[in-house]
């Protein structure tokens, strides 16, 4: 969490400041892993401080590092993005996070090395793009789950 504001109506707004080369495109805005971060901030802020969850808003404040040099129009150095963070999204993100914790760690807090962790390639194998195991025998290309 980078910034937390409270307005005169008792609404809390949580901002997360990100830097990006030229801002976020539509694919980055749809990236559930990226947007889940602020949804979890909202959940944990509500739990920790006892603030009603419906009185918490979230927003990404994206600072562009580069602008198009030969643009024929004015450019903004800052982009704001409000991800979905309603009750359905909150429930889905919380369930996914709890499932991750349950599968990744044992009851004593140690890492679960015995679990099964299927390779989910995702749409157009997007999840594999930067994966260090994509060319490894540990992740057989034929066994990856497409979605």
Predicted segments, located by residue:
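Non-catalytic protein-protein interaction segments used by genome-maintenance enzymes to assemble
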Residues: 1-39, 46
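Metal-dependent nuclease catalytic regions and adjoining charged, substrate-binding loops involved
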Residues: 31, 43-147
């Amino acid at each position: 969490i980078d910034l937390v504001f409270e307005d005169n109506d008792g609404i809390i707004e949580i901002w997360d400041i990100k830097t990006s080369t030229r801002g976020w495109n539509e694919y980055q805005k749809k990236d559930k892993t990226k947007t889940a971060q602020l949804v979890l901030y909202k959940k944990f802020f509500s739990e920790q401080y006892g603030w009603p969850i419906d009185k918490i808003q979230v927003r990404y404040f994206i600072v562009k590092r580069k602008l198009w040099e030969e643009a024929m129009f004015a450019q903004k150095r800052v982009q704001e993005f409000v991800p979905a963070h309603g009750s359905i999204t909150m429930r889905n993100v919380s369930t996914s996070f709890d499932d991750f914790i349950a599968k990744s760690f044992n009851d004593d807090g140690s890492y679960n090395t015995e679990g099964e962790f299927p390779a989910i390639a995702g749409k157009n194998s997007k999840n594999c793009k930067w994966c260090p195991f994509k060319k490894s025998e540990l992740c057989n290309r034929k066994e990856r789950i497409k979605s």
